[in-house]
């Protein structure tokens, strides 16, 4: 039986990576793909082969022009090959759109099958980090495809390559509007809100500025998981940050603890340790258990009867409240697989000592 909950882990299990590559390889008509990075050679090469067999490829990414601008270092530009790879794909016929607030990670093939998840297209994410993903078929794809097409048409930057070999990044200004009716009766969840950075003169975002932009948000769905829990809450993420800007979530977690719900958290103590520490200490203080994992980048939230998987960090500054992120509610079988994933992660961790 095919498992639609997909995992990469530090033991070498790579069902998510293999599912991504297989979905690109079997595409025949079109691919719509969004990711924060396009560095992993296996994915880039698979997209190139799809272009060679006549598949129409549409890409949404974020080359972080706000980060790699005048102050960028040579090392930063050399280490992040995303712009180079997207330029090469554009030369080969891919249609490239760039969003300054994109952090979502998903792939749609032939409007029939999709994968959403936590993994960036980087070697670390696709080879040894713990990552979570979900294979999607059926009606939910329509909502995901609608959002992709809307944001692609209103991308902050379009990438153009001419037959003469010239390449250009063209900024465009438009107003993105989301039709809520297109997302109803779907398991898909989103964040689609311009970050506060758009207020800076040198930052541009075509995403809606309104936090009530017509989507069922990832944040509200996480809150519902917390508020409806009676036995336990498991939250797995790369980082916990800026909880002062997530007061609704923090207060909901406190109320859950007061009604006897057991709360366990997993986050990275590798590349995100310094970012995590302040927020983790606050969560431990109110009664949460925290497990630090060296290589975790998986992202999901569960209770005993519901859950969702998503691309966003638990970060009050970016992701849950602003930016472009994608998530999906879990079926009961998928939730059970996510519980097993959580248990495996905890088995690889050492519980953080109580710092009260």
Where are these regions (language model features)?
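Charged, low-complexity intrinsically disordered terminal segments
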Residues: 1-95, 101-102, 108-356
